[in-house]
Design a protein with these regions (language model features):
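Active-site-proximal beta-strand/loop segments in catalytic clefts of secreted hydrolases
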Residues: 34-37, 66-69, 93-95, 120, ...
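Structural micro-motif
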Residues: 85-89, 104-117
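A short beta-strand-turn-helix
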Residues: 2-30, 37, 47-51
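Extracellular/periplasmic catalytic domains that process cell-envelope and extracellular macromolecules
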Residues: 23-26, 57-58, 83-84, 108-111
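Thiol-/selenol-based redox modules, centered on thioredoxin-like
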Residues: 111-147
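Short acidic-hydrophobic, aromatic-tinged amphipathic segments that line or gate anion-handling sites
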Residues: 12-14, 87-98
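Structural microenvironment flanking redox-active thiols in thiol-disulfide oxidoreductases
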Residues: 30, 37-84, 97-103
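Hydrophobic beta-strand anchors of alpha/beta hydrolase catalytic cores
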Residues: 31-32, 116
Length: 147
């Protein structure tokens, strides 16, 4: 349904060095999201994913959850979402470049978060979701099981 460059870089929370999505997730499929910390659509999405945390862990692929900036990340409280998969890497979307790339490639509204995609390292996007989505965890899993 579109393209996303898996060589796009972000700043992992535990590092000052930029890292590519590909270097984080390895080859194959992965999930990338740009979140709005403390915003209800993002909280809802994270609760949906946490509810299926075991399924995502079994899938075993990388999930990269990005925040627009450090300030947003500091507002994030992972303990509010027990059950989030262990395969998550948190980071900062430096210069807003990843969100911009997804929004442009998928013709999405520029200002609405969260944005989730499932893509592969051949840069093919197979799923996209933006804003408030009921049952996002189930939708993601449905696509994952179809891969």
């Amino acid at each position: 349904i579109g393209n996303f460059n898996s060589e796009s870089t972000y700043k992992p929370i535990d590092s000052d060095e930029l890292k590519s999505i590909l270097a984080t997730t390895g080859r194959g499929y992965y999930i990338v999201a740009v979140l709005g910390a403390g915003q209800e659509p993002t909280n809802h999405a994270l609760r949906d994913i946490a509810a299926l945390g075991k399924d995502f862990d079994e899938w075993g692929r990388g999930i990269v959850l990005l925040f627009p900036n450090e300030e947003q990340y500091k507002k994030f409280r992972p303990q509010e979402f027990p059950g989030l998969p262990a395969t998550i890497t948190y980071g900062i979307d430096t210069d807003d470049s990843i969100r911009k790339e997804i929004v442009q490639a998928m013709n999405l509204n520029n200002s609405i978060l969260p944005v989730f995609i499932i893509a592969d390292t051949f840069n093919r996007v197979v799923f996209v979701s933006q804003g408030y989505t009921i049952g996002l965890g189930e939708q993601l899993m449905k696509v994952v099981h179809g891969l």
